[in-house]
Amino acid sequence: MIHQYKNNGFHIVMDVNSGAIHIVDEVVYDMLPLYQEHSLEEIKTLLQDRYTADEIGEAAGEIEELKNAGVLFTEDIYENYLMDFKKRPTVVKALCLHIAHDCNLACKYCFAEEGEYHGRRELMSYETGRQALDFLIANSGNRRNLEVDFFGGEPLMNWQVVKDLVAYGREQEKLHDKKFRFTLTTNGVLLDDEVMEFANREMSNVVLSIDGRKEIHDRMRPSRNGKGSYDLIVPKFQKLAESRKQTNYYVRGTFTRNNLDFSEDVLHLADLGFQQISVEPVVAAPDEPYASRMEDVPAICEEYDKLAAEMVTVSYTHLGYKIEKQS
């Protein structure tokens, strides 16, 4: 199985089963949909109005080279193992701990309703968190590496319990031959030097919530009194990113119908010095004014194309792609 598409003047072919990605010329690109169902002579006839027989013959040689190298039209070698894989004993490998059902921001698109999840505002107790870690260990089977994300609401509103649970997890590692990877997700309002020092020592990853340009961020992520949070959090996020040597963190933004030009927000975050960036579409009920609509899809695709075109000049990580800044 192959998947073909064009982007920024490139003819791109992905071999689905091997994961190989090829940049090919136009002749090869046009031949590939015909290649497995037609003979070479039939292809020459079908494409004779566009290419010469020699061009098609040369392209066929290139296709055969890729096939013989095992990177084009490859078989799915895992298909026969799929059912056995599904029958394997299941284990729990990760937890997202809602350590705080409360928040100090009032983000307009928040599915947690200012952190309370349509319930009452409260903070997770140490005892509940401890039992959650015990559950994870007890149900992790032979898996050694376990993951826990401190989430909310805003986790820093329950910071002491976060620290206590990390300490408990470290104790349990030794007893059960496990290794915890802790992650902290924060809006940055309560971020300070003490939190940074602890996070740099204990958190394998830190997720920093920011939507991009000041006017975009402040519109969607105000504090409870209606004031924007951009100016408060940006210097802290920059300091944390540098203190982690621009690794093992990422700034996480959400784009809505209010900023369908979200490539500008990605580039803005890169200009602020962030090298690990993820900006994702909002998840919202269709009747929300900021919700993306089907008619917005072409504009959204165009923004991704713009970001792809910036690959050689901007450094950011998005959907698994790390793009290095060129000197």
PLM segments and residue spans:
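Radical SAM enzyme [4Fe-4S]-AdoMet core and its adjacent flexible, acidic
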Residues: 219-231, 238, 242-327
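Glycine-enriched alpha-helix->loop->beta-strand junction motifs that scaffold or abut catalytic
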Residues: 201-206, 273-275
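Alpha-helical scaffolding segments of alpha/beta enzyme cores, especially the outer helices
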Residues: 131-134, 160, 164-171, 194-197, ...
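Acidic, low-complexity/disordered tracts enriched in E/D and polar residues
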Residues: 1-35
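Conserved alpha-helical substructure of the radical SAM core
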Residues: 50-51, 57-197, 202
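Conserved radical SAM core fold
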Residues: 115-116, 155-157, 188-193, 205-227, ...
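Hydrophobic faces of well-ordered beta-strands that scaffold small-molecule active sites
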Residues: 95, 148, 182-184, 206-208, ...
